[in-house]
Amino acid sequence: MAPRLQLEKAAWRWAETVRPEEVSQEHIETAYRIWLEPCIRGVCRRNCKGNPNCLVGIGEHIWLGEIDENSFHNIDDPNCERRKKNSFVGLTNLGATCYVNTFLQVWFLNLELRQALYLCPSTCSDYMLGDGIQEEKDYEPQTICEHLQYLFALLQNSNRRYIDPSGFVKALGLDTGQQQDAQEFSKLFMSLLEDTLSKQKNPDVRNIVQQQFCGEYAYVTVCNQCGRESKLLSKFYELELNIQGHKQLTDCISEFLKEEKLEGDNRYFCENCQSKQNATRKIRLLSLPCTLNLQLMRFVFDRQTGHKKKLNTYIGFSEILDMEPYVEHKGGSYVYELSAVLIHRGVSAYSGHYIAHVKDPQSGEWYKFNDEDIEKMEGKKLQLGIEEDLAEPSKSQTRKPKCGKGTHCSRNAYMLVYRLQTQEKPNTTVQVPAFLQELVDRDNSKFEEWCIEMAEMRKQSVDKGKAKHEEVKELYQRLPAGAEPYEFVSLEWLQKWLDESTPTKPIDNHACLCSHDKLHPDKISIMKRISEYAADIFYSRYGGGPRLTVKALCKECVVERCRILRLKNQLNEDYKTVNNLLKAAVKGSDGFWVGKSSLRSWRQLALEQLDEQDGDAEQSNGKMNGSTLNKDESKEERKEEEELNFNEDILCPHGELCISENERRLVSKEAWSKLQQYFPKAPEFPSYKECCSQCKILEREGEENEALHKMIANEQKTSLPNLFQDKNRPCLSNWPEDTDVLYIVSQFFVEEWRKFVRKPTRCSPVSSVGNSALLCPHGGLMFTFASMTKEDSKLIALIWPSEWQMIQKLFVVDHVIKITRIEVGDVNPSETQYISEPKLCPECREGLLCQQQRDLREYTQATIYVHKVVDNKKVMKDSAPELNVSSSETEEDKEEAKPDGEKDPDFNQSNGGTKRQKISHQNYIAYQKQVIRRSMRHRKVRGEKALLVSANQTLKELKIQIMHAFSVAPFDQNLSIDGKILSDDCATLGTLGVIPESVILLKADEPIADYAAMDDVMQVCMPEEGFKGTGLLGH
């Protein structure tokens, strides 16, 4: 099918030869494209919006043919949420609670701990009514033990694939969005659980934590002098093993028990010797628990960065661990079997994911617990290879060592759990108490009800989809109208009818109607012609309206469009005629004045008028029968002229002909008559028409004022030439010898006066000297002699006595300010005094200084500049200028600076394709001071960025801003200002002397190898509170 624009042209081509009064039914049907050939499926790739008979590509392809039932619904099979046979139940990750889920699964598979918790008394009896639980009440555990009871009961007998531990997490007060230290959580929770169970009367419950997890060791110190041995007994629930520098678990245990020498300042005070003596100290394992928890210290404190980091060291460990060589009392049973491996995925200590590999004590099979997902390992062997491959690669990482049979190695394992081997088989009959089982049954009933409800919803969706499938297959074949009676329906409604994701709404054709309540000819591109049979079914099933039959073809709109198109064709011819007439010179007084702007855009204005008559200006879109407008009519010109009608651009404010001949042009009478056909109401100005008399008077007055201003400016410039040119100016610090008196005016007066003298026709004349701004409310001077030679010199201008006499004649002076030099002493005067009139006001001067200092220290949203330095030598020169022995750099330094600047991304700034000249870092501070003197606006240089800061924000917060601007981590930033190093992160910028417009030098350390640490900088810079405020600490 031809493009849409060609179809539109073809539909109205007959209007070129048919007059409006000759329009017939055939012309109307052609305009509505009734008899265009319908498209064939397979030939037409997409729907032709210009052809109302094209019913291809409207969404029918998904309905033709066989359809899978699953496509009729978006509801997952509820059985996917059902627990598989002989599998375990997962736990939902509430955001960042994966570390909690791993420990819950490990503790759940400790059968002795689970059995003991089931024996704890519960408040669940309060919810019991006879033999059942109150249906209208939900059970809410009150204590940590009750939460664990309920969780373990669900993990044991729930029909769900995973359960929600939010009640347990909420009871502990944990932040679900904050990932915490898993090892610290384990310690704190075991302590909390032991304290909670200590109040139980049943000894099997009260002592379960000690029986399962508690061991004992002694700190043994031996005096080298007398040999006396002292012991300090201590209980432990896990052994914290250092892994740095080790490859095997046994090496870590040996280091833990290694003998330590106490010498020098660290000598031991021996009670037997009653003095400090050299000694040895070591740890002796006295007893080991049934469950031995070995914490591998992967997360350590980095002294260089001041933050935690993860050690990605490979550690080898065996499935069978014989602890007999490490305990003091031999002969017992100390052979342990690996039962769990807790894994941390990720290279950073502040992010990552926790999972657990746990051995089922009943079947001896290994399972991987990953929140909701639980995977059974093939066979009965632990498999860690996949977990190790998931870690991010690093250039410095070592190869994974080979492991023998029964051994494993990991760089992500942070805790190993071993179980004491016994001849007795584990208790396989841990029964859920009746009250807990009833709660589980109730939850299972809710789950089954949900499954049934979801299955019913799926069935309803499938049935509805099948019915829709049959409807579409039947009706789509009957949609083409052919020569039979037809109606029009919007393409959008048909597409929604064929869209299974949205419900079908009633047909609404109101947006397609013209002003005569019939089908608008311009809307035919968004309508489709369908058979009357299909339309009857649509309206009977879905309703809506109005129905657009053959009677809805609007003859009035077609006739009007025919008239407009013929006028547009005529406009094309007239446009060429007018252009030719404008080329000829206008003779005599037969011409007419036309605005130049109107002449440039008269055809567009005429088109807009025709489009307004047509009722739809958007359809023309600046085109006429396919021919575009002149490209020289820019958008800016049209925007300025769109508010004016034709020839109104030469009207003055009084409604008469404007006096500026540059804005208008004389055209011939023939050209004007052509233009007047399209703009009969346009203002008409024959060539003999006089310009506006009022505007002429105003123009003469303006010329007289300009002449007067020029005369005044010339007189003042001649009277004060040196003041205007800023030449031969007196200086307080080098008082001229030929005068003892100098006068003062404000620098603001001088600058405004110079503006007027330079451009007297644009600027207003200066009539008075306002020196009151330099005085306090008491009439005293606000500046000292010393300050006027330095920081306040930019506020005042010094005047010679001869110039002052001229200023008094030319201007009105409100206050006279002068400084007089007086020689003190009768003979050989050795001292010179400078006296100001009026005198200095000490109180106001002191107040001004205090206010200036306060403004410098108390600011908000002020601009400072950070300049990144890329050379160690140069930053030392800037920080300590006194070390500079030469003001120029050596050629070697210059050569070294170039590649550094090119490598740094903050220095790769282009300027029109040419390189910008680098400013020497050695002279950078002096350059900035010169810039400040030359201009009040700071001029940024390459490698520098502006930041908005406040005086009360800390240096650490500024470093965060610098990190975002330069991609340099705070711990890699070395900052200095005016040679002073900024190091106190807790100090505010105000106290550090950072004031608005300051320039801070940034030297970045070499980037760290672990780029993932940049992602954790924001978290690193936040104060680490751990489990503060949670139930683990008794809050």
Swiss-Prot record:
Annotated Basic and acidic residues bias: 895-906
Main localisation: cytoplasm
Stretches for region Disordered: 612-640, 879-919
InterPro entries recorded: DUSP-like_sf, Papain-like_cys_pep_sf, Pept_C19_DUSP, Peptidase_C19, Peptidase_C19_UCH, Ubiquitin-like_dom, Ubiquitin-like_domsf, Ubl_USP48
Modified residues (Phosphoserine): 886-888
Domain Ubiquitin-like: 929-1009
CDD domains, alphabetized: Peptidase_C19L, Ubl_USP48
UniProt family annotation: Belongs to the peptidase C19 family.
PANTHER family: UBIQUITIN CARBOXYL-TERMINAL HYDROLASE, UBIQUITIN CARBOXYL-TERMINAL HYDROLASE 48
Protein name: Ubiquitin carboxyl-terminal hydrolase 48
